[in-house]
Amino acid sequence: MLFLSFHAGSWESWCCCCLIPADRPWDRGQHWQLEMADTRSVHETRFEAAVKVIQSLPKNGSFQPTNEMMLKFYSFYKQATEGPCKLSRPGFWDPIGRYKWDAWSSLGDMTKEEAMSAYVEEMKKIIETMPMTEKVEELLRVIGPFYEIVEDKKSGRSSDITSDLDNVLTSTPNAKTVNGKAESSDSGAESEEEEAQEEVKGAEQSDNDKKMMKKSADHKNLEVIVTNGYDKDGFVQDIQNDIHASSSLNGRSTEEVKPIEENLGQTGKSAVCIHQDINDDHVEDVAGIQHLTSDSDSEVYCDSMEQFGQEESLDSFTSNNGPFQYYLGGHSSQPVENSGFCEDVQVPPGNGNIGNMQVVAVEGKGEVKHGGEDGRNNSGAPHREKRGGESDEFSNVRRGRGHRMQYLSEGTKGRQVGSGGDGERWGSDRGSRGSLNEQIALVLMRLQEDMQNVLQRLQKLETLTALQAKSSTTTLQTTPQPTSQRPSWWPFEMSPGVLTFAIIWPFIARWLVYLYYQRRRRKLN
C-alpha cells in the first residue's frame, strides 16, 4: 500500500510520506513511479502558480501583455490541460477563435509536461516586469532561483592586468606640463619584453633630463639686458605693463616683477635687468621637442586654421630651462659668449640703423626667441636659425595680413612687436592695441565680404528657382490638353462611345454567329 501526500511549495518545501507494508519488498517500478509523480507534481505546481498570476492580472494595470504573448500562454495552457488540438477550425466570422486555434494546433503533439514547462519558461521572461503581488511572490517561491551563475574564466587575464598596474605604480613617471596640460612620460618603467637598445636610450634620456634639471635650478632669473641708449625707466614701466597684460590674458599670475640690477658697466651704456618669478603652473618641456598648444589660450579671433597652432608669447619667458637674455648691441663685432646658450642670431639693421640684434635662447634644442615670441612659427614648430650668415625672413604674410618683425629706430621709443595671431604682444601698449584693432577691422571686413558673397549666391539661387518655376508653368500651359470625349453632363467615367460599344458588341457577335450557321446550313443543303 502506497500513500503519498504533497504540499504546494518550492522544491525544498514539498514532502513525501511513504507507507510501505513490511511484507512487501521495495520495487524498482514503484520507485520510478514515485519519481515521475514527484517531477509531475513540481511541473503542475509551477504551472498552476503561473496560471494564477496570469488570471490575476488586472485589465487596466501597469503591466499589459501583448496579443502574441497571450496567444502563447493560451496555446500552452490548452496543450497542458486538454492535450493536442482535435477541434475543427472556426469559421471566418470568428477571427479571434481562428487565431487561437492556429496557435494551439501549431504545438502539434507536445506533451502536457512540456507544455507546462514552456508556460513557466515564458512566465520567467516577463516576471521581472510585473508588479509584485501575492500571486507573483508565490510563483517566485515555487520556481526558486532561476538565474544562471556564470563562472569567471578570465582569472589569468586579470592577474596580468594587475601585474601591469603594479609595474606602472612602482615606476617613476616623469610628468611634464606644457601650457597647463600634463604630459606623462614613463621613462623609468620599461617592460621585460623591450629590447636592450630601448632601455639604453631610456637611461640616456633620463640622464639628460637630470642634467637639464640641474641647469634649470641654477638659472632662476629672467634678465632682459637692453642697451643702445633707451630710456631706462620708461622701458621698465612698459615691460612691466606688457608682462601684466600678457599674464592677465593667459590667466596666469605674475608674483613679482622687480629690478635686480641697475648698473652694468659696459662702454658707458645703461642696462636694466628684470627679475620675474612665474608660478609653476607653466612649465615647458626640458627637451624642447614636444609642444602642446591650447585652443582656449587664444584671446583674438582666428580667421584661419593656420593660427590655431601658434603658441603664446609669454611661454618664452617661463621656460623650464631658466632665463634667457636678449641683447640689443650697437656693434655687430661683439659676440655674446655663454655656455648655456645654444645659438646666436644676427639680424641686419633696418631703416632705423639700430645695429645688430643678437637673440639667444635657453631652450632644449636651441630655440630662438624673436621679439618676445616663444620660438615657434605659425604651425607650432620651433624656429631654427642658420649660422652661415643666412637668416629666415621675418615677414610671413598670411591671407593678406602682415606678420613681420619691425625694426624701429632710436628716435622712436617703441620696441619690437612679436608675431601676432594668438592675441599676445611683447611690445608697447599702443603697438599692441593698434595691431589688435587692425586685426579686428580686417576680420570684420572679411566677414562683410563673406556675407555679401552669401547674399549674392542666395539671390542667384532665388532668381534661378523663379525662372525654373515660370518655365515649367509655361510648358504645362503650352502643351495641348487632351480633349475629353465625354460631355460635361455625362454621369459615367467612360465615354459614351465606349459604353455604346460595350452594349452593342454582344448583339453583333450573336448576329455574326447566326450568319455563320446559316451559311453552313446552305452548304449542307
Swiss-Prot record:
Major localisation: membrane
A Pfam family assignment: ACBP
Segments crossing the lipid bilayer: 489-509
Basic and acidic residues: compositionally biased ranges: 198-216, 367-376, 422-432
Keywords in alphabetical order: Acetylation, Autophagy, Coiled coil, Lipid-binding, Membrane, Peroxisome, Phosphoprotein, Transmembrane, Transmembrane helix, Transport
Annotated ranges, domain ACB: 43-132
Modified-residue entries (N6-acetyllysine), positions: K460
Gene Ontology molecular function: any one: fatty-acyl-CoA binding
Residue positions where Phosphoserine is found in the record: S184, S185, S187, S191, S206, S270, S304, S419
UniProt-annotated stretches for the region Disordered: 157-216, 367-433
Stated role: Acyl-CoA binding protein which acts as the peroxisome receptor for pexophagy but is dispensable for aggrephagy and nonselective autophagy. Binds medium- and long-chain acyl-CoA esters.
Family: Belongs to the ATG37 family.
Name of the protein in question: Acyl-CoA-binding domain-containing protein 5
Species name: Pongo abelii (Sumatran orangutan)
